[in-house]
Swiss-Prot record:
Organism whose genome encodes this protein: Rhodococcus erythropolis (strain PR4 / NBRC 100887)
NCBIfam families the UniProt entry points to: dnlj, PRK07956.1
Protein name (record): DNA ligase
HAMAP family: DNA_ligase_A (MF_01588)
Needed cofactors: Mg(2+); Mn(2+)
An individual GO BP term: DNA replication
Catalytic reaction(s) noted: NAD(+) + (deoxyribonucleotide)n-3'-hydroxyl + 5'-phospho-(deoxyribonucleotide)m = (deoxyribonucleotide)n+m + AMP + beta-nicotinamide D-nucleotide
UniProt xrefs under Pfam families: BRCT, DNA_ligase_aden, DNA_ligase_OB, DNA_ligase_ZBD, HHH_2
Family: Belongs to the NAD-dependent DNA ligase family. LigA subfamily.
Length: 700
């Protein structure tokens, strides 16, 4: 009785002040995480703060109000998207952080339900929650979690995610329910995240720090086309309101979802008892980087649905599920210095030089800080102890300083005003840019070195022997003045470079290999030439599109901005950069030098391949048996067609393979002809007239 009476005593003023400060701090971090997608502390540090707030409210229950951060899922902050109420609340999950806590939760559950339950063990995806509502099998809305009761409407954006079907597929075993509210996680597959960051770097933009933040930002784009280009994925893992669907277990529900065409995880296991759950927890802790996406824990759920109702929920989380959180992949290290480097397009980038530290299985001593504004935003000083995060193969990121351990010896980083390599005054390329650049593009030693090295890259001429050391050696020995001289190198010139000369004064084996590689590179396809020219924003994807459309460097040079921008996959920014590049005299001199040395400046047309798709826009969706996605696109391009990424009224055909997603439905809606793989093959061989009416599936 005494304990109960004490618990009901009102909180003293000191406790109320502590609660106010702590609640405000938690709200600020929720805002940074859920709204700005830019957290400044680790998940572990946030969990600690929330735990302190929760403990204070446990001690003084009158502090726990409905608007307390402990009672809200995700903070509930307003954004630009239309608000929509969920049919049933989207709850969060309570967390445990070690084996004893996990076993304690299982013991508590089984004390109420009986021993040896079936549990589902699901990898916890580090992504963004999404709520889908299907009525009679059709997706009618998609919304973010928001505060758990109200989210943001993102239906158009969700429809661009290939994993999310616009219509469910009925089966004899699993009829379509009249109403299905299903929850899941939107995420980046690691290879897609790496490709996105590579393209951003190609365009001179700062890469995303981690897949979770970029998934959130990509889903919440005002323009759904941007979301579509980001290649997001989704996995379903929970349910809200359901009508006409009463699964006996969570496992059975997942089987039905998969049958209807909804994405479910292939990493889920059904086990019995605490020992088996702990075994799975340890297994995924050791194999968390073997998964195609980032995971930050293991979700354990009681499998039987009737027990869900029996166990019930708290105000924010179900009692029948728990999240075991793995230790965050963050460490602290000393920031020894911040230095800048000058890239091939003149962009000046500050880098953090740190005491080497092991994180996520690799040793890290260097991390980009992107630009001077980012250094200020993070608030790091030279000499700081900083928090470094690296998950799997993701780019290491300095999250911020540990300010409490500063001793006064730290100093502020000052972005240079002049190029550290050539002394030229730095300036942004255009007003409003956060990046500064060295405008001395032709003669800056750093830019020269980076451009020569870039020529050898796998996306350009792919010359293995021409590494960074070789590029530096060639320039320092003055056997080349710029990248334009590379293909004019011969043995007599190369022997003047120390790294290509033997002790006996002869040309080294690597020197001979370099000459052979340069000679074979002259016959590489046009798109590789375009990439090698270091035109800003032009990476392999845009280069392939331009080469496929125009066929020769001369035609690309003569094209207008509008003509270039009309090419699928190019757009106005890249088009303007191409026109600007060719307007510079010394750029043209590089092209002329390469052409004089025998570098191929146009793609030879294979006369055996008909140009029978000239001007036709064709979309390929789903998996084809005899063509990879790239092979299918290449087959369209060489026949004069355009391999488009989205369906519109201008689309001539949509080619459908396995698991096509919403593009098939869009084609049907617009009346665009749909071809299976056999129809696609006939289209390639004999053109659109050869596609018989029976090949045009517009009925489904």
């Amino acid at each position: 009785m005494t304990e109960t009476a004490d618990a009901m005593q009102p909180a003293p003023n000191e406790a109320r002040e502590q609660w106010t400060e702590l609640a405000e701090e938690v709200r600020q971090h929720q805002f940074r995480y859920y709204v700005r997608d830019a957290p400044v502390i680790s998940d572990g540090a946030f969990d600690t703060l929330l735990g302190q707030l929760n403990a204070l409210e446990e001690q003084y229950p009158d502090l726990r109000t409905p608007d307390s951060p402990t009672q809200l899922v995700g903070g509930g902050f307003a954004t630009d998207f239309t608000s929509v109420d969920h049919l049933e609340r989207m709850l969060s999950l309570d967390n445990v952080f070690d084996e004893s806590e996990l076993r304690g939760w299982i013991a508590k559950v089984e004390q109420e339900t009986g021993p040896e339950l079936h549990y589902l063990c699901e990898v916890k995806i580090d992504g963004v929650a999404l709520n889908l509502v299907y009525e009679n099998g059709k997706l009618v809305r998609a919304a973010t979690r928001g505060d758990g009761r109200t989210g943001e409407l993102v239906t158009l954006n969700a429809l661009t995610i290939n994993d999310i079907p616009e219509r469910l597929t009925a089966t004899d075993e699993f009829p379509i329910p009249t109403l299905l509210e299903v929850r899941g996680e939107v995420f980046f597959r690691l290879e897609d995240f790496a490709a996105l960051n590579a393209s951003l770097v190609e365009e001179g933009k700062a890469p995303f720090a981690n897949p979770r933040n970029s998934a959130a930002g990509s889903l919440r784009q005002k323009n759904p086309a941007v979301t579509a280009r980001r290649r997001l994925g989704m996995i379903c893992h929970g349910f809200g309101r359901m009508e006409g669907f009463e699964p006996a277990s969570q496992y059975d529900a997942y089987v039905a979802l998969a049958a209807w065409g909804l994405p479910v995880s292939t990493h889920t296991s059904r086990v019995v008892g605490a020992d088996a759950v702990v075994e799975k927890m340890k297994y995924w802790g050791e194999h968390r980087h073997d998964v195609e996406h980032e995971i930050d824990g293991l979700v354990v759920k009681v499998d039987e649905m009737s027990l869900h109702r029996r166990l019930g929920t708290t105000s924010r989380a179900p009692r029948w599920a728990i999240a075991y959180k793995y230790p965050p992949e963050e460490v602290t290290t000393k920031l020894l210095d911040i230095r800048v480097s000058v890239g091939r397009t003149g962009r000046v980038t500050p880098f953090a030089y740190m005491e080497p530290v092991t994180v996520a299985g690799s040793t890290v001593s260097l991390a980009t800080l992107h630009n001077g504004s980012e250094v200020k935003r993070k608030g790091v000083l030279i000499g700081d102890t900083v928090v470094l995060r690296k998950a799997g193969d993701v780019i290491p990121e300095v999250l911020g300083p540990v300010a409490d351990v500063r001793d006064g010896t730290e100093r502020e980083f000052v972005m240079p005003t002049h190029c550290p390599e050539c002394g030229t005054l730095l300036a942004p390329a255009k007003e409003g840019d956060v990046d500064v650049r060295c405008p001395n593009q032709q003669h800056c030693p750093a830019q020269l070195r980076e451009r020569v090295f870039h020529v050898s890259g796998r996306g350009a001429f792919d010359i293995e022997v021409l590494g960074y050391e070789a590029a530096t050696g060639l320039l320092e020995a003055k056997v080349i003045g710029d990248e334009g001289d590379l293909f004019s190198l011969d043995a007599e010139k190369l022997i003047e470079v120390p790294i290509f000369r033997t002790n006996a004064g002869a040309l080294s084996a690597n020197g001979k290999r370099l000459l052979a590689n340069l000679d074979s590179a002259k016959d590489k396809p046009l798109w590789r030439v375009l990439v090698a020219l270091s035109i800003r924003h032009v990476g392999p994807t845009a280069a392939r599109a331009l080469a496929g459309e125009f066929g020769s460097l001369q035609r690309i040079r003569e094209a207008s901005v509008d003509e270039l921008a009309a090419v699928d996959g190019v757009g106005s920014t890249i088009a303007a950069a191409v026109v600007e590049w060719f307007s510079v005299d010394w750029h043209q001199q590089i092209v002329d030098k390469w052409a004089s040395a025998g570098v191929r400046m146009e793609d030879e047309r294979d006369d055996s391949i008909p140009r029978n798709l000239e001007g036709l826009s064709i979309v390929v969706t789903g998996s084809l048996e005899t063509y990879s996605r790239d092979q299918a696109k290449e087959a369209i391009l060489v026949r004069g067609g355009k391999a488009a990424g989205s369906v519109s009224k201008k689309t001539a055909f949509v080619v459908v393979g396995e698991a096509p997603g919403s593009k098939h439905d869009k084609a049907v809606e617009l009346g665009v002809p749909v071809l299976d793989e056999d129809g696609f093959r006939r289209l390639l061989e004999d053109g659109p007239d050869a596609v018989a009416p029976t090949d045009l599936d517009v009925s489904e």
